[in-house]
C-alpha cells in the first residue's frame, strides 16, 4: 500500500458554456474586488457550496499546520448572509483548517480572515470554479519541491513544519528524489506511480535502478512494469528481515549498513538482507553459543550447525547420543519449586507475574538437567547447538562414533525399535497417525527439491511409459488433501509440519506473477529457482499416505520407500503426548511402547498406574528421545534384519 500522497485522477471535462461566462465575470469581479477582513466566527460554509464530499481529517490537519507555519496565503471567497454572517463559497478546506486552529486555541475565534465578498448570484459559480479547477500537486512536483528546499539547507523536519507535512513523509519523498532522472521523468509522465518508485528506491545504485526498470518494462504486459516484478528483481537473492526469526536472533548490529537494504516505505520499517550472509551470521553465532556452553559446562568438544544432529539419518554414522540422565533437584530447589507452583496455581489468569513464575521454574528444571550430566559424561562427549523451528536447539551428550561401535549401535537401534503389530492399533488411531505422518513427510519432502523433482518425474513416467501417453497435453492431476489430513491428524493446523507447509505456500504465493491463473506465459518470467520451488512444493502437497483397514488387514504405508530416500524421521516433526497419542492406546500398549524405547524402568512404573497416569508418565519419559512406534517407521533393509539375527545368536 502506498504511503505517499499521489495525484488524484482527473475527471473527464464537461461542456459548461454558461458557466464559462460566469467564470469570466467572476474573474473580472474578483480582480476588481479588494480584500477585507472579517472575524473567523462570522464565517460558515455557504449553502451554495457545490462540494458535498467531506474533507479528510488528514488533509485539514495538514493545511492547519501549513497555515500555522506560514499563515493564510490565499483569501476566501464569501457572500453575505443574514445576521452579519458570511457564507464561504470558495475555500471550505481553509475554513475547516482555521476552525481546527481555533479549537486548539492556536488562534482566537475573532481572528481576522482575509476574504473577498461577491454577490450571492455568483456564489455557485465561485464554488464550481474552486472545486472544478482544484488539482492536487503531482508527486513528481512534490519530489522536486522538497529536493529544492533540501538543497537550500532545510531539514525534513523544517520542510514538514513549513508545509504541513510529517517529517517521515518528507524523508520518503527525498528518498525518491535520489532516483535516476529517467525514472522521475516516467513518474512525471504518469507512466509509473509512486509505488513503482518506492520499489525502485530499494536499490541505491542509479544505474542498477535503470536496469531493473527496463527489465520490468520488458516483462510487463504492454510494456507496463509490475511493482512486484521490480521488488523481486531488486531483492531476488535476499530475504525480508521483518518477522524473520534468524535475523532477530543474529541482530541488526551484526551487519554493516551496506549489507542491509532498508525499506523506508514499509509500514514496519523493515528491509532485506542477503540470505547467504544471514545464514553465515547465524552459523557464526550458533558456533559462539556452542563455544560458550562447552567452556561453561565442561564438554570435550562443541559444534554449531544449521540443523540438529539426526540419529536415524546420515548423521547416524558419525554421531551417537548418550541417554539423558535424570535431573535431580536439591532440597532447597524442591522447596522453592513447590512454593513457585503454589503461587502459580493461585493465579486465575495469565499475567506478568505468572510469566515470571513460569520462567523461574523452567530455569530451575533446566539447570537441574544440565547438572545431571556427570564430569565423566562430559569428558567424552560434546554439545551441539543448531537452529530448529525458529529457535536455538541444544543437544548435550553427543559422541563422535568410532568404526568399532557402528555394529553395536545397529543392534541397539533395532532392539529399541522392535515393531509392535499394527493390527493391534485401533482404526481411528491408525487414521490419525498416518495422517500426521503424511503431513510430516510432505513437509520433509518440500525441503528437498531434488528428491521432489525425482519423485515427480518417476510418477509421470509411470503414466507415460507404463500405459501410453495422453492425447491431451500435460494432462496431470494433483489432489491436495490438507483439509482432511488436518482434520484427522491430532496436531491439526497447529502442527509443525502443516505450519511449515503453509509458510512455504505463503512465500511462493507472493512470487506468483499477476494474472498467472489466466495466462501460463506469465510463468516464463519466473526464475529456475522459483519454478523448482513451486514444483517441489506442489509435489509434496500430492503425497498421500493415510492407511486403511479392510477385512481385518491393514494396508501397507506407501510412504516407506520415500521416507528412506529422503532420510525422514517422524520425531523431526512430531512429539508423542498423552493428548495426541498415548491417551489413545491401551495400557499394555503404553507399557510396550516404553519397553520399545528402552525405558524398562519407566515401563515397570507404568504397570502400577491407571491408564491416564500411565499416558502422562509415557509423555514425560519420551519427550527427550527419538522413539517412534515401529508401525510408523519404514522397514529396515533385509540385510539389517539378517545381521540382527546373527548378533542375537552370537549374544546367546
UniProtKB/Swiss-Prot annotation:
Cite the InterPro entries for this sequence.
Chromosome_partition/occlusion (IPR050336), ParB/RepB/Spo0J (IPR004437), ParB/Sulfiredoxin_dom (IPR003115), ParB/Sulfiredoxin_sf (IPR036086)
Q: Which GO terms describe its cellular component?
A: chromosome
Q: Which CDD domains match?
A: ParB_N_like (cd16406)
What are the protein's GO molecular function terms?
Answer: DNA binding
Q: Where is the composition biased (Basic and acidic residues)?
A: 1-13, 641-652
Keywords for this protein: Plasmid
Record keyword Metal-binding present? no
Q: What highest taxon heads this organism's lineage?
A: Bacteria
Stored Pfam families: ParBc (PF02195)
Does this UniProt record's set of keywords contain Glycosyltransferase?
Answer: no
Q: Give the span(s) annotated as Disordered.
A: 1-21, 628-652
Concerning SMART domains, the annotation shows: ParB
The UniProt entry's GO biological process terms, in alphabetical order, are: chromosome segregation
Tell me the protein family, please. Belongs to the ParB family.
Under the heading NCBIfam families, the entry gives: parB_part
Record protein name field: Uncharacterized protein YubM
